[in-house]
Amino acid sequence: MTQFDKQYNSIIKDIINNGISDEEFDVRTKWDSDGTPAHTLSVMSKQMRFDNSEVPILTTKKVAWKTAIKELLWIWQLKSNDVNDLNKMGVHIWDQWKQEDGTIGHAYGFQLGKKNRSLNGEKVDQVDYLLHQLKNNPSSRRHITMLWNPDDLDAMSLTPCVYETQWYVKHGKLHLEVRARSNDMALGNPFNVFQYNVLQRMIAQVTGYELGEYIFNIGDCHVYTRHIDNLKIQMEREQFEAPELWINPEVKDFYNFTIDDFKLINYKHGDKLLFEVAV
């Protein structure tokens, strides 16, 4: 049993047993298959904590880990909102939210790429500012990136689910706290928790720090009603030992990472389970 499997199953059980239904509301989300309202059971404010002795990834079903890393590179490295850039990597998870101009509007990578921070008399973006400050001002309590920009929310295809990171440097270790306003526990959570842990490992490597703690906070923590039956099946499955994530140690520049610099070794997992997408 991995740290992730244990915490994940605990949250799923809590939602199924104690979650509050939103069936009294006219919800925004619709089932992609038939256009009917996609309702949820939810609880508020859940936290997952990992000591980074193992990579946090689900083993009761397969997580598309390469796709998760490619999306991470698209947002954090390319700082792109162009879905075509993601398609070139063989990833199509954002196709349903693509606007006429081929982008997802002013969301995700668009916000990270804005040159809105001042550094040595120049304007830089949030990622470059973070990398500089972690190296040169490690004791700061202001190591924060933010994707939730009220000025741009109406211009986004989808407002960000994971919207904030806060980084801490203590005793030579880089700790990361992530905040998600909302998490679909069947599809989004295993993806997001893994990919932001990969981000922590990447940034620790290029800034020269050891890995510290990894914390993932969820505001609206929910399960879609059509996902409940398969989640019950998933929770009863055999759990495996955590795999090892290899990251090419030769990469010292954040912008030089490619998907070929990552390997997930001995990833044992349950069979794929299908969960319908709500849009």
Curated annotation (Swiss-Prot):
Q: Name one GO biological process term.
A: dTTP biosynthetic process
Q: Give the enzyme class.
A: transferase
Q: In which pathway does it act?
A: Pyrimidine metabolism; dTTP biosynthesis
**One GO term of the cellular component aspect?**
cytosol
Q: Which lineage do the record's taxonomy fields give for this organism?
A: Bacteria, Bacillati, Bacillota, Bacilli, Bacillales
Q: What NCBIfam families does the annotation carry?
A: PRK01827.1-1, thym_sym
Its assembly, as annotated, is: Homodimer.
According to its UniProt record, which reaction does this protein catalyse?
Answer: dUMP + (6R)-5,10-methylene-5,6,7,8-tetrahydrofolate = 7,8-dihydrofolate + dTMP
Q: What PROSITE patterns does the entry give?
A: THYMIDYLATE_SYNTHASE
Keyword Cell membrane part of the UniProt annotation:
no
UniProt keyword annotations, A-Z: Cytoplasm, Methyltransferase, Nucleotide biosynthesis, Transferase
* Protein name per UniProt: Thymidylate synthase
Q: Residues that bind dUMP, according to the entry?
A: 141-142, 181-184, 192, 222-224
Q: What SUPFAM superfamilies does the entry give?
A: Thymidylate synthase/dCMP hydroxymethylase (SSF55831)
| EC number in record | 2.1.1.45
- Active-site residues, record numbering mapped to chain: 161
- Tell me the InterPro entries matching this sequence: Thymidate_synth/dCMP_Mease, Thymidate_synth/dCMP_Mease_dom, Thymidate_synth/dCMP_Mease_sf, Thymidylate_synthase, Thymidylate_synthase_AS
HAMAP family from the xrefs?
Thymidy_synth_bact
List localization entries: Cytoplasm
Binding residues for (6R)-5,10-methylene-5,6,7,8-tetrahydrofolate: 184, 278
Origin organism of this chain?
Bacillus subtilis subsp. natto
Tell me the function of this protein.
Catalyzes the reductive methylation of 2'-deoxyuridine-5'-monophosphate (dUMP) to 2'-deoxythymidine-5'-monophosphate (dTMP) while utilizing 5,10-methylenetetrahydrofolate (mTHF) as the methyl donor and reductant in the reaction, yielding dihydrofolate (DHF) as a by-product. This enzymatic reaction provides an intracellular de novo source of dTMP, an essential precursor for DNA biosynthesis.
| Any one GO molecular function term | thymidylate synthase activity
Give the record's family classification: Belongs to the thymidylate synthase family. Bacterial-type ThyA subfamily.
